[in-house]
């Protein structure tokens, strides 16, 4: 992987971290960030025709009554398995790479979803965020959610240890 590509991913992560920390400071409770923000955080490709606003922080909750009003934050109900991470220096929780992939299923074509998944299994150790087993396990233990069938359909097109997602399509 070129140094330029790595710097781009690091820059995207830094920008997302700033936006999400800012949103978390305005929140009165824990903020679980996912969707397009998590994709940027992990350096995954963003679907070309994704309808999610790039100007908002997208957070997920388990039920509609847990949504809150926070300026610049859009809450989504996600019924999949909760798999989150948090770094000590961050003020927000973020969806794991595999959970983010599952969340993006309803906003991606099959090809785009496979590209997102493959990018998370990169040959480059600095970019590798998940293994094929991680995806299989997540779908196995996760309850039904919107996009679950598309996730199963994308699995055969996702190859581990590739240099770039387009190698898979």
Where are these predicted regions, by residue range?
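Short gly/ser-rich loop at a beta-strand->alpha-helix junction or flexible surface loop bordering the NTP-binding
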Residues: 1-155, 164-168
């Amino acid at each position: 992987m070129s140094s330029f590509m790595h710097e781009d991913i690091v820059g995207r992560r830094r920008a997302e971290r700033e936006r999400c920390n800012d949103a978390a400071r305005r929140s009165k409770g824990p903020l679980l960030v996912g969707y397009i923000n998590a994709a940027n955080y992990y350096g995954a490709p963003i679907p070309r025709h994704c309808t999610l606003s790039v100007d908002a922080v997208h957070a997920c909750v388990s039920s509609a009554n847990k949504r809150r009003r926070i300026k610049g934050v859009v809450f989504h109900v996600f019924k999949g398995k909760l798999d989150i991470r948090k770094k000590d220096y961050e003020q927000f929780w973020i969806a794991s790479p595999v959970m983010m992939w599952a969340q993006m299923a309803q906003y991606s074509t099959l090809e785009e979803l496979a590209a997102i998944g493959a990018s998370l299994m990169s040959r480059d150790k600095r970019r590798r965020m998940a293994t094929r087993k991680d995806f299989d396990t997540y779908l196995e233990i996760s309850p039904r959610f919107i996009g679950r069938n598309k996730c199963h359909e994308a699995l055969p097109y996702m190859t581990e240890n590739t240099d770039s997602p387009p190698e898979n399509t």
